[in-house]
UniProtKB/Swiss-Prot annotation:
Motif PDZ-binding: positions: 493-495
InterPro entries the record matches: BTB/POZ_dom, Ion_trans_dom, K_chnl_volt-dep_Kv, K_chnl_volt-dep_Kv1, K_chnl_volt-dep_Kv1.1, SKP1/BTB/POZ_sf, T1-type_BTB, VG_K_chnl
Note: The delay or D-type current observed in hippocampus pyramidal neurons is probably mediated by potassium channels containing KCNA2 plus KCNA1 or other family members. It is activated at about -50 mV, i.e. below the action potential threshold, and is characterized by slow inactivation, extremely slow recovery from inactivation, sensitivity to dendrotoxin (DTX) and to 4-aminopyridine (4-AP).
Organism: Mus musculus (Mouse)
Origin: domain of life: Eukaryota
Activity regulation, per record: Inhibited by 4-aminopyridine (4-AP), tetraethylammonium (TEA) and dendrotoxin (DTX), but not by charybdotoxin (CTX).
SMART domains documented for this protein: BTB (SM00225)
Null mutant phenotype: Mice are born at the expected Mendelian rate. After three weeks, mice begin to display episodic eye blinking, twitching of whiskers, forlimb padding, arrested motion and a hyperstartle response. About 50% of the homozygotes die between the third and the fifth week after birth. Surviving mice continue to display spontaneous seizures occurring once or twice every hour throughout adult life. The fecundity of homozygotes is extremely low.
Stated name of the protein: Potassium voltage-gated channel subfamily A member 1
GO cellular component: anchoring junction; axon; axon initial segment; axon terminus; cell junction; cell surface; cytoplasmic vesicle; cytosol
Keyword Transmembrane helix belongs to the record: yes
Region of interest: Tetramerization domain: 1-128
Assembly information from the UniProt record: Homotetramer and heterotetramer with other channel-forming alpha subunits, such as KCNA2, KCNA4, KCNA5, KCNA6 and KCNA7. Channel activity is regulated by interaction with the beta subunits KCNAB1 and KCNAB2. Identified in a complex with KCNA2 and KCNAB2. Interacts (via C-terminus) with the PDZ domains of DLG1, DLG2 and DLG4. Interacts with LGI1 within a complex containing LGI1, KCNA4 and KCNAB1. Interacts (via N-terminus) with STX1A; this promotes channel inactivation. Interacts (via N-terminus) with the heterodimer formed by GNB1 and GNG2; this promotes channel inactivation.
Length: 495
């Protein structure tokens, strides 16, 4: 503990790291003293002692800035007192001692340690590194258009919860998607199926040749499909011209799905027109198999629902984060299929009633056995084959069970991130007695917003920051007047 001389020294002069002016006659002696000067930090009764130069490595933090830490100084005990979590401070002090390495103690929960990082003002960079070390996926920031009108249109179509009209557009979009999927399914019913697939066939009636054609343009299913495509095309074009980056627009998988959803209609329309012209000349323009494959692509419209469903978004994020585990699962299954299909083939080779004519023919049996489906269309009949089948089923259960916990853990992370963000959006969390600096407030006003939750918080500031009184500090999916980017993370407002 450092003892300062002078009985009538004020509080600032008695604080560690704040010597009274003129107390050191020579600058060299002052530097040597400050280099070795120690400071005592009391964390809820547990005292820590370190050198001032250790804290001075990070002057923008609470402990590294003499002015910021002064309000916690106790002149009677000549120490700084913080009524904070004691186990967490071991890691906080190590952050200063190691030059920026942050490690969470195993007995401290994630949320509590995050609060300590915010309280000691270690900075956004330290928080991001901590989240990455803990396995959190780095949040993606999306820029917004610079023009106000373009920005409003983009928010209207991209963020359904940003306003009432945006919700209406989202509801209309979901209804159109559902109608399109229902039409896709209903048109295959035999009682509703048209004979348009047989366009161009020739029927002989009373020794006369008649070319039978069906007009697709009068088909009710085609009319409803056309209305759906008009909406999909309008939505896609508006979002394309309103997006802040045309390159990023085409890189987005959801926009690619939107394009794929409307392409089959225009291809089908072109082929139908070509076939009608071909029928007039007595020839068929397009193969029915090609048309059926093109129509099959329409089923991908169901993925458009993921734009409006948090559950599907969570599932997609889980699969994306679990690609390594899924790759290992497929690799293990591949090895098992090769191994057990070969084993069962040679085990059943001498059996006349064997269902396995070759090793590739046994691939199907190995897959359904390892996945414990067991259709029963192929099965071993010898003792050796049954032993191989038993081992195949056991190996399949173990292989599938290995990566499942990691995938479930990823799902829980994304699910709780969504639900916790909804809870945080209902509260204004105060984690520090310090008001934000001008630079922090201006940085926040440039703002990052969450993609899922919206909340508008209006804080009445005191007279010292009256120029911020009229500012609306928004977190969640709300925007400010000078907002330039969108952050998909969940935010807490610290005042």
């Amino acid at each position: 503990m450092t003892v300062m001389s002078g009985e009538n020294a004020d509080e600032a002069s008695t604080a560690p790291g704040h010597p009274q002016d003129g107390s050191y006659p020579r600058q060299a002696d002052h530097d040597d003293h400050e280099c070795c000067e120690r400071v005592v930090i009391n964390i809820s009764g547990l005292r820590f002692e370190t050198q001032l130069k250790t804290l001075a490595q990070f002057p923008n933090t609470l402990l590294g800035n003499p002015k910021k830490r002064m309000r916690y100084f106790d002149p009677l005990r000549n120490e700084y007192f913080f009524d904070r979590n004691r186990p967490s401070f071991d890691a906080i002090l190590y952050y200063y001692q190691s030059g920026g390495r942050l490690r969470r103690p195993v007995n401290v929960p994630l949320d509590m340690f995050s609060e300590e990082i915010k309280f000691y003002e270690l900075g956004e960079e330290a928080m991001e590194k901590f989240r990455e070390d803990e396995g959190f996926i780095k949040e993606e920031e999306r820029p917004l258009p610079e023009k106000e009108y373009q920005r409003q249109v983009w928010l209207l179509f991209e963020y359904p919860e940003s306003s009432g009209p945006a919700r209406v557009i989202a509801i209309v979009s979901v209804m159109v998607i559902l109608i399109s999927i229902v039409i896709f399914c209903l048109e295959t019913l035999p009682e509703l199926k048209d004979d348009k697939d047989f366009t161009g066939t020739i029927h002989r009636i009373d020794n006369t040749t008649v070319i039978y054609t069906s007009n697709i343009f009068t088909d009710p299913f085609f009319i409803v499909e056309t209305l759906c495509i008009i909406w999909f095309s309008f939505e896609l074009v508006v979002r394309f011209f309103a997006c802040p980056s045309k390159t990023d627009f085409f890189k987005n998988i959801m926009n690619f799905i939107d394009i794929v959803a409307i392409i089959p209609y225009f291809i089908t329309l072109g082929t139908e027109i070509a076939e009608q012209e071909g029928n007039q000349k007595g020839e068929q323009a397009t193969s029915l198999a090609i048309l059926r494959v093109i129509r099959l692509v329409r089923v991908f419209r169901i993925f458009k629902l993921s734009r409006h469903s948090k559950g599907l978004q969570i599932l997609g994020q889980t699969l994306k984060a679990s690609m390594r585990e899924l790759g290992l699962l497929i690799f293990f299954l591949f090895i098992g299929v090769i191994l057990f299909s070969s084993a069962v083939y040679f085990a059943e080779a001498e059996e006349a009633e064997s269902h396995f004519s070759s090793i590739p023919d046994a691939f199907w049996w190995a897959v359904v056995s390892m996945t414990t489906v067991g259709y029963g269309d192929m099965y071993p009949v010898t003792i050796g084959g049954k032993i191989v089948g038993s081992l195949c089923a056991i190996a399949g259960v173990l292989t599938i069970a290995l990566p499942v916990p990691v995938i479930v853990s990823n799902f829980n992370y994304f699910y709780h991130r969504e639900t916790e963000g909804e809870e945080q959006a209902q509260l204004l969390h105060v984690s520090s007695p310090n008001l934000a600096s001008d630079s922090d407030l201006s940085r926040r006003s440039s703002s990052t917003i969450s993609k899922s939750e919206y909340m508008e918080i209006e804080e009445d500031m005191n007279n010292s920051i009256a120029h911020y009184r009229q500012a609306n500090i928004r977190t969640g999916n709300c925007t400010t007047a000078d907002q330039n980017c969108v952050n998909k993370s969940k935010l807490l407002t610290d005042v």
